[in-house]
């Protein structure tokens, strides 16, 4: 199989995801604009309350404007790195038996949904980016815009790990009929581990160093910290390395679960 054919096929899957999400425009508007706007507003109010309650001008060496900028960009990056819609679809394909139709086609299950995820995240990023951009300019919050390309590169690289974890969870549907619950538990854990809830450097040692070293910090804390001047480029390269290790380990587990599951699978779909 040539690379050109591989690229065209996956580009078609990505376009399919974009078109299918834009088909219901009101739903997409709520998903891409309203939801991140509300999330950002809640987190900003939270940090206002924290500083007012503490009666301090700085927390851990950073003033209120840095935490407001973190909340703005944090809600945006968290929206990109969160995956549940395609994870649910993958689980449903296996659980219902309709995966049979995918197994006989000239592409892998992983590839089919990964391309759709990336297409969906790409268009959602372009649309929802208006929210933090407008807010940052209105409130004049610290942001190093020249760092955006590298921050986005890390975020979309991290999406490979996100999808790989979703693939592992979906493969669990070969063995469990309540695997949907794992998705909810995983998303709650990542809410903390990515740094969406609060910056990871506010944690006490050694928990702080452990959480930052884990690949999940690449979801929110590292790109947002780098973008707002909280972190320097060395932490970004370390995060790239950590995500790479995570991708290798998780995909090895996923490949093993998938092969074993397919071998014993008895489908009921067409």
Predicted features along the sequence, with ranges:
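Hydrophobic transmembrane alpha-helices and immediately adjacent juxtamembrane helices
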Residues: 1-270
């Amino acid at each position: 199989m040539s690379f050109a054919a591989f690229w065209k096929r996956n580009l078609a899957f990505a376009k399919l995801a974009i078109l299918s999400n834009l088909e219901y425009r009101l739903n997409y508007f709520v998903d891409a604009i309203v939801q991140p706007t509300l999330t950002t507003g809640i987190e900003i109010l939270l940090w206002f309350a924290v500083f007012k309650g503490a009666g301090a001008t700085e927390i851990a060496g950073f003033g209120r404007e840095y935490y407001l900028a973190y909340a703005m960009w944090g809600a945006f990056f968290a929206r990109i790195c969160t995956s549940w819609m395609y994870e649910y679809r993958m689980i449903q394909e296996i659980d219902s038996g309709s995966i049979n139709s995918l197994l006989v086609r000239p592409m892998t299950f992983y590839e089919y949904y990964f391309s759709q995820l990336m297409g969906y995240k790409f268009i959602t990023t372009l649309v929802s980016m208006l929210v933090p951009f407008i807010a940052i300019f209105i409130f004049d919050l610290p942001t190093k815009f020249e760092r955006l390309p590298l921050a986005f590169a890390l975020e979309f690289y991290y999406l490979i790990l996100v999808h790989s974890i979703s693939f592992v969870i979906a493969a669990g549907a070969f063995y469990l009929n309540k695997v949907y619950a794992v998705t909810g538990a995983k998303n709650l854990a990542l809410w903390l581990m990515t740094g969406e809830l609060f910056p990871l450097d506010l944690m006490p040692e050694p928990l702080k160093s452990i959480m930052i070293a884990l690949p999940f910090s690449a979801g929110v804390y590292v790109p947002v910290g780098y973008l707002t001047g909280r972190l320097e480029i060395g932490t970004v390269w370390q995060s790239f390395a950590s995500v790479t290790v995570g991708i290798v380990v998780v995909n090895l587990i996923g490949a093993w679960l998938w092969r074993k599951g397919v071998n014993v699978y008895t489908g009921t779909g067409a």
